[in-house]
């Protein structure tokens, strides 16, 4: 992310294609292999910015948090709703306005977190979790992160090797935390 950031529809689409759809399609492509393993793991990279508490719409929060009724189809409809709202200039009106900058990045991580929970429910024999590894020194953060890439890799690697049986969880580095 750069210091000056203006979201265009093309950039919004690109962000969602990379952060949400890319993760989703890769996971779905690998599921047959993961299911045939006795130790299948999926570790999705998220962000503290993707927590539900940043949504100012109680209805959207409730829908995204209702893991018993949220489906992949409903989640994809929510992603489409976000895109449509952006295109129509109606993010705030439709409850998608997120505080601060980088709204689509935040929304994409909210969608990643929801997908993680749905997939964990659908595939109980796999360990599917998401992690926010912390603010990292990358081009995306203009190298302002507080940790190196090597340091940030510790938490995803920990989850990839974890045998605890825990699934569908959100980790803040190495600690389980709430999706809020």
Report each predicted region and the residues it spans.
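C-terminal helical subdomain
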Residues: 25, 110, 130-138, 142-180
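A short, exposed helix-loop element centered on a Lys and neighboring polar residues
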Residues: 27-28, 117
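Flexible domain-boundary/linker segments
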Residues: 32, 47, 59-62, 129, ...
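Catalytic cores of secreted/periplasmic or lumenal enzymes
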Residues: 125
């Amino acid at each position: 992310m750069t210091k000056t950031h203006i979201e265009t529809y093309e950039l919004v689409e690109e962000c969602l294609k990379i952060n949400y759809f890319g993760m989703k399609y890769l996971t779905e492509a690998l599921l047959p292999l993961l299911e045939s393993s006795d130790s299948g793991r999926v570790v999705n990279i998220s962000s503290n910015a993707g927590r539900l508490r940043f949504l100012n719409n109680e209805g959207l929060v409730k829908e995204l948090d209702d893991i018993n009724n949220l489906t992949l189809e409903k989640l994809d409809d929510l992603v489409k709703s976000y895109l449509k709202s952006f295109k129509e200039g109606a993010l705030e009106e439709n409850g998608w306005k997120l505080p601060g900058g980088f709204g689509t990045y935040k929304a994409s991580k909210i969608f990643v977190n929801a997908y993680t929970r749905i997939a964990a429910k659908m595939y109980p024999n796999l360990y599917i979790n998401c992690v926010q590894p912390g603010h990292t020194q990358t081009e995306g953060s203009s190298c302002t992160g507080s940790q190196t890439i090597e340091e940030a890799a510790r938490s995803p690697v920990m989850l990839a090797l974890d045998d605890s049986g825990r699934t569908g969880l959100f980790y803040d580095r190495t600690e389980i935390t709430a999706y809020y």
